[in-house]
Amino acid sequence: MNLNQLEYFCAAVECGSITKAAKKLFVTQPAISGAIRELEKEFSVTLFSHTRSKLSLSADGERFYERAERLLREVETAKMQLHDLGGSRQPVSVGIP
């Protein structure tokens, strides 16, 4: 599992469509489908119940979405904190006798 897979999965959930998620993220539809398929394979679950007109989360998908969304928020928070720390670095001088 990697962050791109989580991002693609969450986008598909939020957009309600793999096609719309692909457009939102500026990637191809097969990239989104493949990422979701890899997640399903890795965890041996079905994340979506596919119907002709709508993409619906399965029970496993709902639980996974909550955690995936939380993980992506945590990663974004960590990035912002590291960025803030990077801007406030002070040089350290070390003297060796």
Specify the residue positions occupied by each region the protein language model found.
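Short alpha-helical "packing" element that flanks the helix-turn-helix/winged-helix DNA-binding module
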Residues: 8-12, 64
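Helix-turn-helix DNA-binding elements, focusing on the entry/boundary residues of the two helices
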Residues: 17-18, 36, 50
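The N-cap/first-turn positions of alpha helices
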Residues: 2-5, 29, 61
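Interdomain hinge and pocket-entrance segments immediately C-terminal to HTH DNA-binding domains
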Residues: 83-97
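Short helix-boundary/capping micro-motifs
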Residues: 12-26
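Alpha-helical linker/hinge and terminal dimerization helices associated
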Residues: 42-43, 64-86
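A short LG(V/I)-centered, amphipathic sequence patch enriched
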Residues: 40-57, 76-79
